[in-house]
Amino acid sequence: MTLIFIMISAIFVNNFVLSRFLGICPFLGVSKQVETAVGMGVAVTFVMALASAITYVVQYAILDPLSLGYLQTIAFILIIAALVQLVEMIIKKSSPSLYQALGVYLPLITTNCAVLGVALINIQNEYNFIETIFNGVGAALGFTLAIVLFAGIRERLETSAVPKALEGFPIALLTAGLMAIAFLGFSGMKLG
């Protein structure tokens, strides 16, 4: 049951975009259309889930036994960069239109602080391997949920009468803030 709690917490209560403000760049940059938001969400989910598992193994099989903890951040960034390259090659071959739509934001997953943040928090919270995977997948699903909801709202705002001073980025920031407040409501949720 604790695995479900870890996942639900990562999706709703500790959403990395809306409560920890990690991954804001792709959240704001790729959320203009639902289709591209879903594509980015799937790519981040794949990278974050694999990065969580691989960084756990690297931390406890290599870095800790060899007392190389000071290389943790560099090692994790290299792992994430390699995974992003893999995802980029897969998307380029399987969906050229999605690859084109994601544009510069796909390589930016390498520097997406949410992916690195999840890997580091998994180690900091001393999760075991299974808990690490559940937290990584939950965090990725939370990112995907947030970016897809935000993209849906932004699509609707494009056809709405928005005051001139709030058109574009200002209304996007206000909307993101309101979403963060809405997700804050989950923090009082009692599970079990």
From Swiss-Prot:
**Family stated for the protein in its record:** Belongs to the NqrDE/RnfAE family.
Q: Where are the transmembrane segments?
A: 4-24, 38-58, 71-91, 101-121, 133-153, 169-189
NCBIfam families for this protein? PRK05151.1, rnfA
What organism does the record attribute this protein to?
Acetobacterium woodii (strain ATCC 29683 / DSM 1030 / JCM 2381 / KCTC 1655 / WB1)
Write down the top EC class of this protein. Answer: translocase
Q: What is its EC number?
A: 7.2.1.2
Q: Which reaction does it catalyse?
A: 2 reduced [2Fe-2S]-[ferredoxin] + Na(+)(in) + NAD(+) + H(+) = 2 oxidized [2Fe-2S]-[ferredoxin] + Na(+)(out) + NADH
**Quaternary structure, from the entry:** The complex is composed of six subunits: RnfA, RnfB, RnfC, RnfD, RnfE and RnfG.
Q: Which GO terms describe its cellular component?
A: plasma membrane
Which Pfam families is this protein grouped with? Answer: Rnf-Nqr
What's its job?
Part of a membrane-bound complex that couples electron transfer with translocation of ions across the membrane. Couples electron transfer from reduced ferredoxin to NAD(+) with electrogenic movement of Na(+) out of the cell. Involved in caffeate respiration.
Q: Its membrane topology, per UniProt?
A: Multi-pass membrane protein
Statement: the UniProt record of this protein carries the keyword NAD: yes
Q: Which InterPro entries match?
A: Ion_transpt_RnfA/RsxA, NqrDE/RnfAE, NqrDE/RnfAE_oxidrdctase
In Gene Ontology terms, what is a biological process of this protein?
Answer: electron transport chain
Q: What is this protein called?
A: Na(+)-translocating ferredoxin:NAD(+) oxidoreductase complex subunit A
Q: Which UniProt keywords apply?
A: Cell membrane, Electron transport, Membrane, NAD, Translocase, Transmembrane, Transmembrane helix, Transport
State the compartments where it is located. Cell membrane
